[in-house]
Regions:
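Short, conserved beta-strand edge motifs with alternating hydrophobic and charged residues
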Residues: 2-7, 35-38
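Residue-level recognition of the N-termini of beta-strands and the immediately preceding loop/turn
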Residues: 1-2, 75
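Aromatic-rich peripheral "rim/lid" segments of glycoside hydrolase catalytic domains that contact
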Residues: 15-125
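Surface-exposed cleft-lining segments at the edges of enzyme active sites
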Residues: 6-14
Length: 125
C-alpha cells in the first residue's frame, strides 16, 4: 500500500469530523500518505436560491479544507469532477445541482474561491 484515498462526498450534517480526524491520525501514524478524493458537497438540504446555496456549499468546502489542511500527511486533494455538468448528483435531484467548484459552463463559483483560499492559506503557513 502506497497511500490511502478517502472518498469525501460531504453531506452536511452527516460528517462526524472528530471521528474522521481520528481516522486520518491513525492512517498518518502508519506512515501512509493521505489523499482526499472525490471531494464534493451534496447540496440537497441547502436553499433553493442559487446564490445562497452556492455560499452554503462554499462554506462546507472552506470548513472541511481548513481542518484537513492542518493535518500532517494530507498530500492530495481531488474533487469528484470540476463542473456541476458532470456531477455524480446530476439527475438525482429535481433541481440543478451546485456541488462542485465550477458551474455547468465552467464558470468559477464561490466553492472554487473557498478551495483556492484554503489552499493559499495553507501554502503561506
Amino acid at each position: 500500500i502506497d497511500a490511502i484515498g478517502l472518498q469525501c462526498h460531504l453531506a452536511p450534517g452527516n460528517l462526524d469530523m472528530e471521528a474522521f480526524l481520528q481516522l486520518v491520525e491513525q492512517i498518518r501514524q502508519r506512515g501512509l500518505p493521505i489523499y482526499i478524493t472525490e471531494l464534493d458537497v451534496n447540496d440537497q438540504i441547502f436553499a433553493d436560491d442559487i446564490a445562497e446555496r452556492d455560499q452554503q456549499v462554499a462554506g462546507v468546502y472552506s470548513d472541511f479544507l481548513q481542518e484537513m489542511l492542518q493535518q500532517p500527511g494530507i498530500e492530495i486533494i481531488q474533487t469528484w469532477q470540476l463542473s456541476d455538468k458532470y456531477s455524480f448528483y446530476q439527475g438525482r435531484q429535481e433541481r440543478q445541482v451546485r456541488v462542485l467548484p465550477f458551474d455547468r459552463e465552467m464558470q468559477a463559483k464561490p466553492a472554487y474561491h473557498a478551495v483556492a483560499q484554503a489552499l493559499a492559506i495553507q501554502g503561506n503557513d
